[in-house]
Amino acid sequence: MASKKHVVCQSCDINCVVEAEVKADGKIQTKSISEPHPTTPPNSICMKSVNADTIRTHKDRVLYPLKNVGSKRGEQRWERISWDQALDEIAEKLKKIIAKYGPESLGVSQTEINQQSEYGTLRRFMNLLGSPNWTSAMYMCIGNTAGVHRVTHGSYSFASFADSNCLLFIGKNLSNHNWVSQFNDLKAALKRGCKLIVLDPRRTKVAEMADIWLPLRYGTDAALFLGMINVIINEQLYDKEFVENWCVGFEELKERVQEYPLDKVAEITGCDAGEIRKAAVMFATESPASIPWAVSTDMQKNSCSAIRAQCILRAIVGSFVNGAEILGAPHSDLVPISKIQMHEALPEEKKKLQLGTETYPFLTYTGMSALEEPSERVYGVKYFHNMGAFMANPTALFTAMATEKPYPVKAFFALASNALMGYANQQNALKGLMNQDLVVCYDQFMTPTAQLADYVLPGDHWLERPVVQPNWEGIPFGNTSQQVVEPAGEAKDEYYFIRELAVRMGLEEHFPWKDRLELINYRISPTGMEWEEYQKQYTYMSKLPDYFGPEGVGVATPSGKVELYSSVFEKLGYDPLPYYHEPLQTEISDPELAKEYPLILFAGLREDSNFQSCYHQPGILRDAEPDPVALLHPKTAQSLGLPSGEWIWVETTHGRLKLLLKHDGAQPEGTIRIPHGRWCPEQEGGPETGFSGAMLHNDAMVLSDDDWNLDPEQGLPNLRGGILAKAYKC
């Protein structure tokens, strides 16, 4: 095996292509690619990728299957066992649970975006077994964006930096260590004269690079977009030909945006009306214009409307036909993930049992059913797996786990997913996990979720596995990632676990691929190549449908056109047009509560050295950002009597957490930023330490998933604007 490999870094979710080389001492050196690449510009490597081998070889990595032999869940009494014993016992217990409660009693949380090695086989296993209850943190991070894109224009839309003359950024905190490849794409675009509009309450480095910076109030993005649409329509700046030929609902949209004149939008957002108009005109006239994905609008009370309004902005200025935006499709080189997943094997009565169907159906099988025929017409697949699809609602899943209503969920798998910390209302997630008869965790470290498991199975590292991207449909390009070294210890790939369990559950005939390499060869079989040859090409662009040409097939919506007025949302009983409603817990909507909780909370803002709840183990990455930090503007901190460098409590009506305070002039006055995913792996596990600090430091302790705090269409929690908080000394 050659020592130098071409690898897709999976340290975060941007997936930069890097080179990896095994040195004489056995350590792996990762560095930026040396040749031109269509998806990754030169010098695109961050500190997480540079130090990836320190995580792979960390002394605390789980290298062998472990069984908790304690008398109660969460008791840290671990016994090393074999894979065969673990799989045999898991299968036996799962069979008993299914016999008693039905297959829907299995719930699964999976992280697809950083794993990318099972190619739909987990959903295949669940569908054949009869469980619809798969969920992911993608429910509130890009997966929901993809869902909204689908109902609006059939598929997820990618911004093309190289083909854009104007970029609209929404709270994207790019840097040399955060989405570095896109940061380099941005700098290259600006160098050639591309315009940049930035919407961000914080004065970030990217905001300082902008032609127009709109420091809007947290959570008011939907209102600002509606104001921009108002300007573009009323000033006749839209692409009339595209709107007339390929959009439906324009007149209804035009009527709706009259409710959002610039003076009203300025009052809502806190931005200058003239600057909003200037941004709208720039976006419409500096064509082609694009809006790269940003997580901020995935996590708001008005999330669905904010995402819908972005789709509409792209459409009415012609971005889908001038090269600025690319509508994806199942990759032409690959067997569709949807075919592998076998959604048709899941009975209709089980689809209707998917948790969340009755309360927040949009992202479930029921909500997506209106897109089955259009997807089959355009893409040849009925169940289009576009960046996470057909998901159980996380709140409904954890509630069923905790309360056994509307029915019991008694077995839970966390696959590359720190599920305890990954969703809002961590208290309820803990109750749900404690109420399980079987918890299985597949991961690299003893995470807080793993500490609650019956079995912890050692997962492989991205330097230890070959990968064919993507692991979902709708991405117009793909990359191959070569295996650099064999997995450490007894670590296995995700497909190994899925297939071996499927065999023990009587499903072997549906898993004909004996190992991951056979599965990869099946996935790439349309090319006529096998992995040994295919991996050498490094990247591959998909052949996309002709959506909008003279013989265009249209998009995969019920009308075949971009639905400015959504027939899918109308059918589900939702507002078919975007809107802005003030969240129920702000200083405007609840001034009395704001007297006790005077701060507006913002959860997130990525840090350089970690990704979500990963890479907090002691070492070079943790040393860069050792503590969980809250950010307050110096004036706000002074008014509260809170000096920088002291530990504080941050409290909402839902809970509180302990953080180290740092004064930050970029943080808007009257607001507080809290980090996501912080815990202390160096601490002992178990309930005595709050599962290594997770119950003390993680943002989900203060984030409610009650109905008042959920986006009404998607049923996802508001994390980024519209939650009142207070801060005080410990």
From Swiss-Prot:
GO MF terms, alphabetically ordered: 4 iron, 4 sulfur cluster binding; acetylene hydratase activity; metal ion binding; molybdopterin cofactor binding; oxidoreductase activity
Field pH dependence: Optimum pH is 6.0-6.5.
Entry's cofactor comment: Binds 1 [4Fe-4S] cluster. Binds 1 W-bis(molybdopterin guanine dinucleotide) (W-bis-MGD) cofactor per subunit.
Keywords for this protein: 4Fe-4S, Iron, Iron-sulfur, Lyase, Metal-binding, Tungsten
Chemical reaction(s) catalysed: acetaldehyde = acetylene + H2O
Species annotation: Syntrophotalea acetylenica
Protein name per the record: Acetylene hydratase
Protein family membership: Belongs to the prokaryotic molybdopterin-containing oxidoreductase family.
EC annotation from Swiss-Prot or TrEMBL: 4.2.1.112
Catalytic center residues: D13
